[in-house]
Amino acid sequence: MIVCPPKYRTFLSFCFAAFFALGAQAEPAEFTLLDVQGVKHKLSDYRGKWVVVNYWATWCPPCLTEIPELVDFHEERKDKDAVVLGVNFEDISPNALKQFSEEYFMNFPVLRTKPGPNSALGPIPGLPTTYLVSPEGEVVARQVGPVTAVLIADFIAQQITK
């Protein structure tokens, strides 16, 4: 896990919140995607928990940098209040993606979708792009660029105290 020095944590948390927060939606977000095992995952299956939906690709260096952060976050929170869904955003065979996810010890569901400018949650202007979905199914935040476990946890904590 990457550790942020305390003197920068408040500043980074503020920047993360400023660039990450989105306005309210009319309806809960929804998608259904297959994982590397061929199992369907519906976003609504995770209602009641925060869902970190991370769009990434195997060829994307910043994506690879944040994988350990997402693994740590998922491991720490999956049985409590939050999960990570990794959505692979490239044309890659299911077997190659499965092997990659095993090599990187990805402990969260690795889903597949076809690349394009948009997703079910909103635009994908670059990779990685991470959306945060509230326990009620509302997309509350988006971050383009890498995230850390601490920044995600801090943002969720801020949302809970609102």
Per-region residue spans from a language model:
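Bacterial N-terminal signal peptides
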Residues: L12-A21
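Boundary at the C-terminal end of the N-terminal hydrophobic targeting segment
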Residues: G23-P28
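Conserved redox-active cysteine motifs that mediate thiol-disulfide chemistry
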Residues: Y55-D72
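N-terminal secretory signal peptides that target proteins for export/translocation
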Residues: M1-Y8
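Thiol/disulfide oxidoreductase modules built on the thioredoxin-like
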Residues: Q99-M106, R112-A157
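Conserved segment of the thioredoxin-like fold in thiol-based oxidoreductases
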Residues: T65, E75-K114, L127
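Short pre-active-site segment immediately N-terminal to redox-active cysteine/selenocysteine motifs
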Residues: K49-V51, Y55-W59, G126
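A short beta-strand-turn-helix
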Residues: E30-V51, L121
